[in-house]
Amino acid sequence: MKVGLFIPCYINAVYPEVGIASYKLLKHVGVDVDYPMDQTCCGQPMANAGFEDEAARLALRMEEQFKNYDYVVGPSASCVAFVKENHPHILGKRDHVCMNSKKIYDICEFLHDVVRPESLPAVFPHKVSIHNSCHGVRELHLSSPSERNIPYYSKLRDLLSLVKGIEVFEPKRVDECCGFGGMFAIEEPEVSTCMGQDKVCLLYTSDAADDR
């Protein structure tokens, strides 16, 4: 299988080490991965702000960039969820069929559901606390949402359990929003900041904080 690595614009600009680590990780587990150099934003900021025509142009560009790959994999649940859930609507109104939505995965989802490694040659003898993102939980189903009465599961915890020496914890309110929410953080910065501070406090008071 041939995988195209989708790196969202905020990761490219602010956290490039995440993109590099994603590429190395996929290579390490035996994936034939490529990084299309001309890729750009998926269009989520424009769509969230109401500029659907601009978002559609970027969606079409992304379709062209990734059309020859079996899978599209990205290290961002939010951007992956936008492509999966919103690109078909945006492009469908313009008589274009969205192919990326059928083959795009968050990197954790891809490792868990497609690659399915039975072990990882990794050692991390520390306590860690999981951040369950809103889009990851409720749109990509990376873990069970707390508001639904269904059995607990966590694809993130499953993957981390393959790392030797690690102890995994979750905060008391496991999937509370961090306050980012894309445009919400820009339009409501004060509320967003307070929500982020609450989230940090939850993580700091989890059992993983004892390892500091």
Model-predicted segments: where are they?
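Extreme N-terminal starter segment of soluble prokaryotic enzymes
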Residues: 1-3
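Local cysteine-cluster metal-coordination motifs and their immediate loop/turn environment
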Residues: 8-12, 38-48, 75-81, 131-139, ...
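Immediate flanking context of iron-sulfur cluster ligation sites
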Residues: 29-38, 62-63, 68, 165-175, ...
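Short, structured active-site "lid" loops
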Residues: 50-71
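Glycine/small-residue-rich loop that forms an oxyanion/phosphate-binding "nest" at active or ligand-binding sites
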Residues: 89-96
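Anionic-ligand binding region
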Residues: 146-163
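A short, acidic, amphipathic alpha-helical segment used as a generic capping/interface helix at domain edges
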Residues: 191-203
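Conserved small/polar residues in nucleotide/adenosyl-binding loops
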Residues: 204-212
